[in-house]
Design a protein with these regions (language model features):
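N-terminal amphipathic/basic leader segments beginning at the initiator methionine
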Residues: 1-23
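Structural motif
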Residues: 5-6, 57-59, 80-81
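Fold-independent oxyanion-binding glycine-rich loops
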Residues: 10-11, 63-64, 85-87
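Conserved N-terminal alpha-helix of the aminotransferase class I/II PLP-enzyme fold
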Residues: 16-66, 91-93
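Alpha-helix C-terminal capping segments
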Residues: 51-52, 70-78
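Conserved PLP-anchoring active-site segment centered on the Schiff-base-forming lysine
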Residues: 74-92
Length: 94
């Protein structure tokens, strides 16, 4: 299939709050979840990116600032300082 069908985020229904909470924990295991973080459309795009780029996995973010922040925060701790060039994406410096 070239394009998987689009799955609307509002169609993900949980029987209990506990079931919804468990789905949120298991997002890395392709468990259906509400929003951009766990629909079949989302998982198909991740799989395509892994195949195209030859990667081991793929994380999707709603914007560039979120992606940059996650990359930086995975290496620094509270109180750390980082050096960056003046030409970096402006919101990152803030």
């Amino acid at each position: 299939m070239v394009n998987p069908p689009v799955q609307r985020a509002s169609t993900v229904v949980f029987n209990t709050v506990a079931e919804k909470n468990q789905a949120a924990i298991n997002r890395a295991n392709k468990t259906l979840f509400y929003g951009r973080r766990g629909t079949n459309t989302h998982f198909a795009f991740q799989d395509a990116m892994v195949e195209i780029e030859g990667g081991a996995g793929c994380a999707l973010y709603p914007c560039g600032t979120a992606a940059i922040s996650n990359a930086i925060l995975s290496f620094v701790e509270a109180g750390d300082h980082i050096l960056m060039v003046d030409t970096c994406y402006e919101p990152t410096r803030d």
